[in-house]
Structure formats: C-alpha cells, structure tokens
C-alpha cells in the first residue's frame, strides 16, 4: 500500500554505472558530482544509490561504482567524505570483497580504493571507520595486493637486437596479411556477470605484448594508480595518457606526463594504438558539427536575452527548436575541450623544452666564443731578458733563408727609434734587437770573400746598412715612420752636439750597443764584412748574462760613453786603404742618392 520514496540519484548513478558502457563515461560522472554539490542531501542520497549498485552482480557495474565513488571523493569535499566513511558504505565494500562470487579484478580494486580513501581521510579522526575497514580487509585477505612493480634490469645489446628483429618480423607479417585482412564482426555487448568488457580488454593488454618496443609505441594508458617509491619514477593515475619516450630497462619505459619525465612499469599500462584514418575523419566530422552549431547557440542566447521575462518559453517554438538542436552538441563539445586541453598542455611542455634547449645552446656557444682556441702557429714567444734566442749549432753555417712569414715584422711605434741589424738568434717579438755592450773581444777575421751572403734586397728604396755576415736573412722591413730615427754623419764628419745628446739620451734608455743607429734617408758610409756564424755564437748577446755553453769574457765591460769621451760609433776607414781583414770601407758615388747597383756592395 505504501511505496518507498524513490531516490533522486538512482537514475543518475545508474546511468553513470551502466553495464553496457565500454569505459568510464566522465560526462555522466561529472553530472552526478554537480548534482551532489547542488543539493543539501545529495551526498547521502548518492551514497545510498551507490550501495545499491555495489550489490549488482555485474562486475562492470561494481567497477564503475567504485570509480564514481572515487570521483565524488575527489570533487565534493567533506560532505561526501563523511558518507563514504560511514558504517553502511564500508560494510557494503567488505561484503563485496569477501564474497567468493566477486570477480577477481574487483577485489584488488576495492582494496586499492579503500587504501586511497583511508589516506585521504587520515587528517580527520571522525572518518576513522574507513581506515579500520581497510585494515580489516587487508587482514582477512592478505593475498589482495595491487600489481607488483617489476625489477629493474638493464637492457643488454642482445635484448635490443632481439627487439629489433621482432619489430621487423611484425612489420613483415602485417604487410603480408594486409591484403587478405577482412573486417571483423562487431561484438555484441554481453550482459553476463562473469567478466566485464573493459576489464577483459585490460587483461589482454595489461602487460605490453612481447616484441613491442618503445620505438613502436607512442602512447600508453595507465591501468592503475602508480606511486613512485624511488627517485626518477613517474607518478600517474588510472586513465592518464603517457607519452612514451624510450626504453630504459627490461620492463620499464621512460615517459612524459604533465610536464614530468620518469620511468614507469609496463604492467601498469596498456598500449594505445595510433588513430586510424577513419577515426581521424570521424573526429574532423564531429568538430565540423560542433562549429556548425555556433550560430544557433548565439541566436538562442540573443533571443533569450532580448525577450521579456513574461515570455513563456514553452510556447515559443523557435526557442524550443534551437535549444534542442544545440543540446545535442554538448557531449561532443566536452570531448573536444578535453582533447584540445591535452594538446595545449603538450604544446606548452614542448615550448618549455625548446626554450630550455635554446638557452643551453646559447650558453655553450657563448662559452666557446669567450675562450677561442689558440692558433697553432702564432707569434714567437718572448725570450726572457738576459737569455739569447735559439741559434744554429756551432760549426754549421746557416743555410739560405726559407719562406717564413715571420721573417720580417714591423716594430711597434714606440720602439722605432733604433733599428739594429739582425743577429743569428731569433728577433725579439717586440720588434727590436736586445741591447748589447759597445764592444767585445774580437777574434781573427777571415778574408772578406771567405763567406758571402746569398740574399740581398735590391728592390729597397733606401740604401739600408747591409746585414752582417753572421746571418743570411734580409733586413727587417722598414716603415715610413723610420724617418724619425737618429741620423748619423758620414765617416770623418763631426757629430753635431744635438744629435750626440739625443744619442746619449737614447743610450740611457737602452744598454750601450756596438752597432750604430741607422738612417733611412742617408746611405751608409761603411759596410761590414761577412763573418762566419760561429764567430757570432761565441759572443754573448748580453754582457750581464752569458750563455752557459760560452766562456764569459775575461775583461770588464767598457764604461758608458760620456760627453768627455766620445767614442767613435763605428770604425772610420779611409777609402782605398786596404783593410787587412778588418773592415772594408764603402763609398757610394753620390752621398744623397739611392744605390743603383746593390751588388757593388760586396766586392
């Protein structure tokens, strides 16, 4: 006579946990969440409706009910937490888990959800019933455990080669079977309570099939929640789509999810096949339908906003038709929102990775440019003051000069006051010859024609003093600024006082030298006879630092010349007088003209 009052959530919960669903329908689940949050007694009525669905004998219904309860716990706050931690709901879970007719995939799911809820409610002591029920279930069923994580084993070269062979074999089989492949008949939905359809599919693809490598799989779907226990592992929840990056261990792959990168076990995920051409066309058609209804939605909004509040909407056929036509695109719109939200997240992550890679590249490029590689052949190193440069071994005359780009180099402007003839040791990198004493012990000189240089500079505009016989290298290249150097008078002419004072001032800056400065504007008045290389090697370049293999001079160096005693800067010889092996004077035909025949210098 009296009928029980019908629960307002029975239809919504039954729709969200329908046994004919192939997977969780999040549109229906979110509708239940919104309804629970909107009504005062929504949490109590929703839990009562879920208790009824847990008593259903279909495993799909039981699994969908557990998923709905978890979604309510995540979205509806303390009200639903109190109802989930009630004695009636926990007893219903324990009865289902202890029933021997319950499917084997439902029992681990009950234990997994109760563990999550116990951890979620741990901060509130009023919800301790859930933790007690979880500990009771764990004690009564010690074998109920979530899938264990496989051990991490490094992939050997043989394993990689085997994966490659299996990949090639699978590709060959797919190419061979493609022409004869026939469309498979669609499977009718089963209403039996034995094995759920979604869990059957998950069981077949729970472990990634053998022969499948990270190179052939781009995406996987999580079958269970995974909490990392070690650094470097990727955390995910059931239903997450993970992008596969590479294969790291035997049963672990590396993937990316929500901007995080890490490894995950293969038995927690299932392979997602790449979309086919038909699926892509179907998605494009669905998007076209949604965008085609934009005008109707805007028109409906305009009509509703301009009409008066006294208008009866039910009597207006235009508004009713527009409403029903636009209502059909809501599920498609929600699906597209989820799809493009995921794509947006992926593009955002890709942009962040690109920015990081660009910054790393620019920093490395800047570091390499700030420290350029030194050239293999550069300027010769500077010889320390007081030590001679490298010279030829004793007893061997130096050969003809080679085409060396460093033979001639210009002195720096501040060092162009004096130019000294080159000696057998390497020139100073700063463009000047190391200073030497005014005189050294002279050995017996051979005849002038015993050793003649083989190279000269006939193309020179100025008659520079020719080189000594100690080296066959040409004179350093002169610069136009050489006109600033100190002139010297011809042989026998007195030295002007100003010039002598300037020369004395320069002698204070440099140690006294046995060679006079030269003038680019005047020809030399005396030449120097050639000397064998070994003669120069016997005299130290610096009087204060003798070379180790040379004996030091037996006498003290002469004093610095002063105004009282004016030493002759170079030997003065009368033309036509035989030199007797000492120095041979050379007089040009014209004092101020350039030497037209440089070969006449050596005679």
Curated annotation (Swiss-Prot):
Pfam family, one: GAT
Cross-referenced InterPro entries: ENTH_VHS, GAT_dom, SH3-like_dom_sf, SH3_domain, STAM, VHS_dom
Topology term for the membrane: Peripheral membrane protein
UniProt region (Disordered), positions on chain: 140-164, 177-212, 371-603
UIM domain location: 162-181
The keyword Protein transport is annotated on this UniProt entry: yes
Subcellular location as annotated: Endosome membrane
Biased composition (Polar residues): 461-473, 586-603
Biased composition (Basic and acidic residues): 151-163
GO molecular function: phosphatidylinositol binding; ubiquitin binding
All residue ranges annotated as the SH3 domain in the record: 215-274
Keywords assigned: Endosome, Membrane, Protein transport, SH3 domain, Transport
SMART domains: SH3 (SM00326), VHS (SM00288)
Cellular compartments per GO CC: endosome membrane; ESCRT-0 complex
Compositionally biased region (Low complexity): 180-210, 374-397, 498-508
Predominant location: membrane
Domain VHS residue range list: 16-145
One Gene Ontology term from the biological process aspect of the record: protein transport to vacuole involved in ubiquitin-dependent protein catabolic process via the multivesicular body sorting pathway
Comp. bias regions, Pro residues: 487-497, 540-561
Subunit structure: Component of the ESCRT-0 complex composed of HSE1 and VPS27.
Similarity comment text for this entry: Belongs to the STAM family.
Protein purpose: Component of the ESCRT-0 complex which is the sorting receptor for ubiquitinated cargo proteins at the multivesicular body (MVB).
The protein's name in its UniProt record: Class E vacuolar protein-sorting machinery protein hse1
């Amino acid at each position: 006579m009296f009928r029980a009052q019908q629960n307002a959530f029975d239809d919504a919960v039954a729709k969200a946990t329908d046994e004919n669903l192939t997977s969780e329908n999040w549109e229906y689940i979110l509708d239940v969440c919104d309804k629970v949050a909107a009504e005062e007694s929504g949490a109590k009525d929703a839990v009562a409706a879920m208790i009824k669905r847990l008593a259903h004998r279909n495993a799909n219904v039981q699994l969908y009910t557990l998923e709905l309860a978890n979604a309510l716990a995540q979205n509806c706050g303390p009200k639903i937490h109190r109802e989930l931690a009630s004695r009636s709901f926990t007893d219903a879970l324990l009865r289902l888990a202890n029933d021997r007719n319950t499917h084997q995939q439902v029992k681990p799911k009950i234990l997994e959800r109760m563990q999550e809820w116990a951890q979620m409610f741990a901060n509130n002591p009023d919800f301790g019933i859930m933790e007690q029920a979880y500990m009771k279930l764990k004690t009564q069923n010690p074998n109920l455990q979530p899938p264990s994580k496989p051990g991490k084993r490094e992939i050997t070269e043989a394993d990689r080669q085997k994966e490659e062979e299996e990949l090639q074999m699978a590709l060959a089989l797919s190419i061979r079977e493609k022409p004869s492949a026939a469309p498979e008949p669609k499977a009718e939905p089963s209403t039996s309570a034995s094995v759920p359809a979604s869990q059957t599919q998950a069981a077949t693809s729970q472990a990634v099939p053998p022969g499948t490598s990270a190179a052939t799989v781009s995406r996987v779907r999580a079958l269970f929640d995974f909490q990392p226990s070690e650094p470097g592992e990727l955390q995910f929840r059931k239903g997450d789509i993970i992008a596969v990056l590479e294969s790291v261990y035997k049963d672990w792959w590396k993937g990316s999810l929500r901007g995080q990168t890490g490894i995950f076990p293969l038995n927690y995920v299932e392979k997602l096949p790449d979309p086919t051409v038909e699926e892509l066309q179907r998605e494009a058609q669905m998007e076209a339908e949604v965008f085609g209804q934009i005008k109707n939605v805007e028109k409906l909004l305009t009509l509703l906003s301009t009409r008066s509040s006294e208008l009866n909407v039910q009597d207006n056929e235009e508004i009713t038709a527009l409403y029903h036509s636009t209502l059909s695109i809501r599920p498609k719109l929600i699906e597209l929102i989820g799809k493009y939200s995921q794509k947006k997240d992926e593009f955002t992550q890709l942009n962040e990775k690109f920015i990081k890679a660009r910054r790393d590249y620019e920093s490395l490029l800047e570091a390499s440019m700030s420290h350029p590689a030194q050239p293999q052949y550069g300027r010769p190193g500077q010889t320390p003051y007081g030590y001679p440069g490298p010279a030829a071994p004793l007893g061997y005359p130096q050969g003809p000069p080679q085409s060396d780009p460093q033979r001639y180099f210009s002195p720096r402007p501040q060092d162009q006051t004096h130019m000294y003839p080159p000696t057998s040791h390497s020139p100073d990198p700063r463009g000047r010859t190391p200073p030497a004493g005014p005189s050294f012990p002279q050995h017996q000189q051979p005849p002038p024609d015993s050793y003649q240089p083989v190279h000269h500079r006939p193309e020179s505009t100025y008659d520079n003093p020719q080189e000594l016989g100690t080296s066959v290298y040409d004179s350093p290249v002169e610069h136009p600024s050489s006109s600033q150097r100190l002139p010297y008078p011809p042989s026998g002419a007195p030295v002007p006082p100003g010039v002598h004072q300037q020369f004395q001032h320069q002698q204070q800056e440099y140690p006294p030298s046995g060679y006079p400065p030269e003038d680019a504007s005047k020809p030399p008045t005396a030449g120097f006879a050639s000397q064998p290389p070994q003669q120069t090697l016997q005299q130290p370049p610096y009087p204060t630092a003798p070379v180790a293999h040379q004996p030091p001079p037996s006498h003290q160096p002469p004093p610095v010349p002063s105004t009282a005693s004016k030493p002759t800067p170079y030997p003065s010889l009368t033309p036509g007088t035989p030199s007797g092996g000492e120095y041979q004077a050379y007089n040009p035909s014209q004092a101020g003209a350039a030497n037209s025949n440089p070969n006449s210098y050596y005679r």
